[in-house]
Structures are given as structure tokens and as C-alpha cells.
């Protein structure tokens, strides 16, 4: 068996492997059969057709491996399947009613969808550009597309439970041993990991290290009951409560405070030390302990009972911590690390598909990214065009209604388009029209519109918008900054997912001028 490597003389050239098989081992003839892979990847920058040979003498010695003829390949792809395309010819419009098991039999399933997207030029995993942590991250999604299955798999029941709060978490002098941002330099996916002795806890590797209960460093506490009712940093409180060993720790003043979780009673945004913060009030569930008010950062993640990761600003949280989150609501119960519900809870049906795999934090973040890309791609193609069939065969067509209703909606959209075209205007309900992302004020108004509507029951929506606009003008720059950052991140994500949307907008504007 002879191996020969042929490569192009250029930085990112695609290498071709020529495998020369010796048929004499199979008892046939002495002729040689040449098997060559000549797939030219269009996603490779600067590729040309140079076939210059380069002999490599420092290759390691290769040994032939006898394969078992009784074992069949786990994944088989037909000749018309590539790393970027679907076998479109094998599908038709009548496949939307085929159950999911049939798709698996045809070897086209959810994992195949992710594999095709992962190897496409648009995939962030295939891009070599390096992102700065302070710059807007391109991997972000709205709160509707966020899902908790991006979490690493829960700890198996066979693993032994450790104490909920190891003492080195309470010691400022003992730093976390290894803290890194997984895949930050390659794909821009930020997933902070804490690989310390408490990795066996319910806190997965992607969970940020807490100082006390569910609160991160930089949080300020104010207990409504007790000897000290003044504001104090969570680091100082943890250091005052912590002792030399676990037994002394149990004798702390607030021993077991909120051990079953902290229920959110109220929340508001304020400015503390020149920085916009969240002021949250929690109920520990016991009258004798009293309430707790905290001031935390806007992107602070919380693990909510029966809900998973949650945040007041999911877009900021996924940028800062790499944790996809749902939105926080009044009444949510925050769980501390090591809580039984935090270890065993999993609300994702899609996540069951991946339970048999041993995901690292980097892998789980990649799963979230690719899955989010797949959903966004299907959503953008579901309303019409040639991509509509892709959405119909994906198994998610149930969310779009029956075929009859789809045809009816398409007909109505077409009728509106013809009517608007005849009057010289551009249809705003075009099937390929992308929604413009919300700006900072729209995000602000969305958050407070319900509250102001309840405050002024006699006013209509337009009057409420005027009131919201007045409050927006009176806000300080640091108070507006959080909405500006979130709007900028959403705009970057919209540009990444739908680059043609912005071009089409400019084209429509120019056509209207003519």
C-alpha cells in the first residue's frame, strides 16, 4: 500500500490525497487502481487548479488496517450529497406528512441538518476570523430562539453528590485554577469554564462560578432582617460567613438561606456607582429569614426552577457568558448550585437526541449555534420560494399549519403584492421580506409598554408610545447604553443570518426613487 500526498503551493490550499491500492493482496491482478478525491471546496479562499506535486518524506509510517466485512458503515451518503447541499432530487412536496422515523430511515435527520450547516461557508465554525470579546458577537439570537438544550448534559445519577458550597469558593485567596473561554479565538463562542475541584457538582462546566448562592462576583446584597441591614458586596459577605472548614461554615448567620431557591418578587433598573444595574428583591420562602434585595449586572444569568437558564437581557448574557437564556419573569425561583432540580432538570425534547454523546462546553455551544442557525434558516425560507420545500421536509412544518392554510396565505400574499405593484408601491408583506431588528428605543418600549398601559388604563397605544418617548428622552446615557448594546447585537445577528436583507432594502429604496 502506497500513500502519496499532492498539495497546492498556496496558504489555504485544499490537499488531495491519492490512495494507491495494491490489488495483489486481494488475489486479483498486478495492476494498480487509482482512487482520487478531487472535490474542490468553493469555501476555500484563493483556491486555484494548480496540480503541482510535492513529495513528503517525513510522513509517519502507515499501516494497513484489515476491516471487518461484516460491519457496515454507520453513516452512508449517496453520490449526490455534498458537505454543502441537500439531495434535493430525492424530495418532493408530499414529504411533509412523512413521520420522523421515515426521515431517519432515509438517513436524513436532525444531525445531518446540523452537519450540512456546520460545513457551509456561512457557519461560524468554518470562519477563520478572530473576534474580540469586547466587540459584538455574531452568535446571538432573540429570546424566542434560545433554548436550554445548549447546556452540557446533566450529571449522571451514578456520580456522588458533593457538598453544595465547597469552602474554596468562599475564599478569595484561593483562585479558580483554570478559567478559560472555550473556542473564543476560533468561533467567537464564549463559554466560561471553571475546571476546579467542584466540577462534580450540579454546576456544569459552562456555569460561571458563584460567590454565594446563585450570585456572581460584583453583586451587592442587602438583607431586610438581621444585625447587618446595610449594603455589602457578596465577596465580603461570603468571606464573613465562611470559616476554615465546612463544619464552621454551617454555623453561619444565614445558614441555609434560600436553600430551596429564591423567589423573585420585584425588579427594577437603577444606576449604582455610575453603572446601570438590576435591583431585585427575593423571598427565601421562610418568614424568619426575611427578604433579600440585590444589585447585580444586567447580564447576570440565573438558573430558574422548571425553566433553565434565564436572564433579563438574554442577548447580553449570551455575549458575556456564552449561556443561552430565556426571559425572566416575576415569580421565578432561582436555584443555588448543587440543587437537586438544577442537576436533574431538563426541559428540552430536542436535547434527548444528544444524551448519548459526551459533550464538552465547546461542543454544547456549537450545538446551540448550529441548531439556532438551522431554525433561523428554516424560518426565513418557510414563507415561500424554493427553500419552502426544505422547510416542509424538515419535520417542523407542523408549526406552519395545514397545506390548505399555507396555500391560502400564499394566495393572499400574492394578491396583496399584485395590488401594491399596480399602485406603484412596494409590498411590505413580501414573502422574502425580512423584519428589521428593533432599535434601542423599541427594546425599551417593549419592556415597559405593558407596565405603562396598566398605569394609564384610559390611554390608547399611541398615547402610551408618547409617554414612553418622553421617558426615553429623560433617561441618562448610561441608562440607555444597555438597550443600545442589545440592539446592536441583534442587528449584527440579523446581518449575519440575512445578509441579502440589507442589500434588498437599499435596492428597494433606489427603485422607489426612480
Swiss-Prot record:
Compositional bias annotation for Basic and acidic residues: 170-182
Keyword Iron-sulfur annotated: no
Keyword terms of this UniProt record: DNA-binding, Nucleus, Repressor, Transcription, Transcription regulation, Ubl conjugation, Wnt signaling pathway
Span of domain AXH: 203-345
UniProt xrefs under PROSITE patterns: AXH, HMG_BOX_2
Gene Ontology biological-process annotations: Wnt signaling pathway
Pfam families linked to this entry: AXH, HMG_box
Role summary: Transcriptional repressor that binds to the promoter region of target genes. Plays a role in the regulation of the cell cycle and of the Wnt pathway. Binds preferentially to the sequence 5'-TTCATTCATTCA-3'. Binding to the histone H1.0 promoter is enhanced by interaction with RB1. Disrupts the interaction between DNA and TCF4.
Known partners and oligomeric status: Binds TCF4. Binds RB1. Binds the second PAH repeat of SIN3A.
PANTHER family xref list: HMG BOX-CONTAINING PROTEIN 1 (PTHR15499:SF3)
Protein name per the record: HMG box-containing protein 1
